[in-house]
UniProtKB/Swiss-Prot annotation:
InterPro entries: 4pyrrol_Mease (IPR000878), 4pyrrol_Methylase_sf (IPR035996), 4pyrrole_Mease_sub1 (IPR014777), 4pyrrole_Mease_sub2 (IPR014776), Dphthn_synthase (IPR004551). It is found in: Cytoplasm. This is Diphthine methyl ester synthase 2. The lineage of its organism: Eukaryota, Fungi, Dikarya, Ascomycota, Saccharomycotina. Keywords: Cytoplasm, Methyltransferase, S-adenosyl-L-methionine, Transferase. Its main location: cytoplasm. It comes from Candida albicans (strain SC5314 / ATCC MYA-2876) (Yeast). S-adenosyl-L-methionine-dependent methyltransferase that catalyzes four methylations of the modified target histidine residue in translation elongation factor 2 (EF-2), to form an intermediate called diphthine methyl ester. The four successive methylation reactions represent the second step of diphthamide biosynthesis.
Length: 299
């Protein structure tokens, strides 16, 4: 049996009771180590808490070496541990498909992830639209596929959760070209970088999916002892020191409920100023009034 087990957001003890019991009985235990990190735990503390040796599974192993993970999983129990919830990344869906093609049974044990814990910032989960990812730009590569999705969310008044890039065990182009297994230091996108990249793409596209004054909420180290929220405009957050990783960003939609707004006030520097920007943004994205089609006489 292959078990996909969510670990939650921060502590080694965030695993569910059923998840922990399952880990303890598995022959092999893998920890997916490239889409996220546990902020208050490491491999050593996990092994001590679970009482099991853990094999780190990097991107290369999961995406190209899945046969190694699935080896003998039809005869013995194998655990695949994922920070957050197992289905927070499409990579894990691919692993399940591969297992089923090999006739291996699969069971999933869910847990909290940023996708539901984001509600801790005070915004209502059913007011969120499509979630988007924001990757680190380079001098020659500045993908903007997220832009259209933000525009769609904003037009119908929904908030947008932006998941910020994580670079773990990545190679430089030069090292890849030379076939050298030398990896870059880990990098985690912070709030200021995310806001700056968003503003850069808006300056290029100029379709006004958002503006420098669009209200946002910065989320840092969600679920950890140092969890922090900061509400402000995109321009303000482009200069915000968000501290240690991990980070996410929420761009507010037009339909901000008064209870959401009241909750956000505790995270702002200037309540009246923030309220004014929210009101301006709501007016900016106010849809045009519906005009019914004219009757056309049929002859």
């Amino acid at each position: 049996m292959l078990y996909l087990i969510g670990l939650g957001l921060s502590y080694e003890s965030d695993i569910t009771v059923r998840g922990l019991e399952t880990v303890k009985k598995c022959k092999r235990v893998y920890l997916e180590a490239y889409t996220s990190i546990l902020m208050a735990a490491n491999q050593e503390s996990l092994e001590k808490f679970y009482g099991r040796e853990i094999i780190l599974a990097d991107r290369e192993l999961v995406e190209t070496g899945s046969d190694d993970i699935l080896k003998d999983a039809d005869k013995e129990d194998v655990a695949f541990l994922v920070v957050g919830d197992p289905f927070g990344a499409t990579t894990h869906t691919d692993l399940v498909i591969r297992a089923r093609e090999l006739g291996i049974k699969v069971e999933t044990i869910h847990n909290a992830s940023v996708m539901n814990a984001v509600g801790a910032c005070g915004l209502q989960l059913y007011q969120f639209g499509q979630t988007v990812s924001l990757v680190f730009f380079t001098d020659s590569w500045k993908p903007d596929s997220f832009y259209g999705k933000i525009m769609e969310n904003r037009k119908i008044g929904l908030h947008t959760l932006l998941l910020l890039d994580i670079k773990v065990k990545e190679q430089s182009i030069e090292n890849m070209a030379r076939g050298r297994l030398i990896y870059e230091p880990p990098r985690y996108m912070d709030i200021a970088t995310a806001a700056q990249q968003l503003l850069e793409i808006e300056s290029i596209r100029q379709e006004q999916a958002y503006t420098p004054n669009t209200p946002c909420v910065a989320i840092s180290r969600l679920g950890s002892p140092t969890q922090t929220f900061k509400a402000g405009t995109l321009q303000e957050l482009s200069e915000y020191d968000s501290g240690e990783p991990l980070h996410s960003l929420v761009m507010l939609g037009r339909q901000v409920h008064e209870l959401e707004l009241e909750y956000l006030y505790q995270f702002v520097d200037d309540k009246e100023k923030f309220k004014k920007f929210v009101e301006q943004d709501q007016e900016f994205f106010k849809p045009a009034p519906y005009v019914p089609p004219e009757d056309v006489d049929s002859e």
